[in-house]
Amino acid sequence: MFSSAQEPLALLIELTPKLAKKRFRQCIYDEWNHLCGYCEEPATSLDHIVPRHRSGSSNRHNLLPCCRRCNQAKSSTRMEEWYVRQDFFTQARMDKITSWTKQGIVDLFA
């Protein structure tokens, strides 16, 4: 089946980062019930709450599941500026997003 005893290990090493990324993303979707954090439509992507070009990281508490429409509309705008102007804005969802991002800060110093 394999040409050498090391080949299965090489395949595992190649697959591990991809699988880890998939599981990482899946956990975030699961925590948000696969719904957009902004409008609660089905989520199809992850948005950087603090955009990458504004020093936003790709850690789990800076990533928010969102629908394509919200991700494209927000683009690289700061979440606080963009979200409050949306017709679907709710303070409850804003509080949930803010709480999510603060968990990341707590995790850093725990």
Q: What is each residue range found by the language model?
A:
Residues 1-33, 91-109:
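Short, charged surface segments at domain edges that flank catalytic/cofactor-binding sites
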Residues 25, 52, 71:
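Generic anion/oxyanion-binding catalytic loop in active/binding sites
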Residues 35-65, 74-84:
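Histidine-centered nuclease catalytic patch
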Residues 61-62, 72-110:
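A detector for short metal-coordination/catalytic motifs
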Residues 68:
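Active-site/pore-lining binding-face segments in mid-to-C-terminal subdomains
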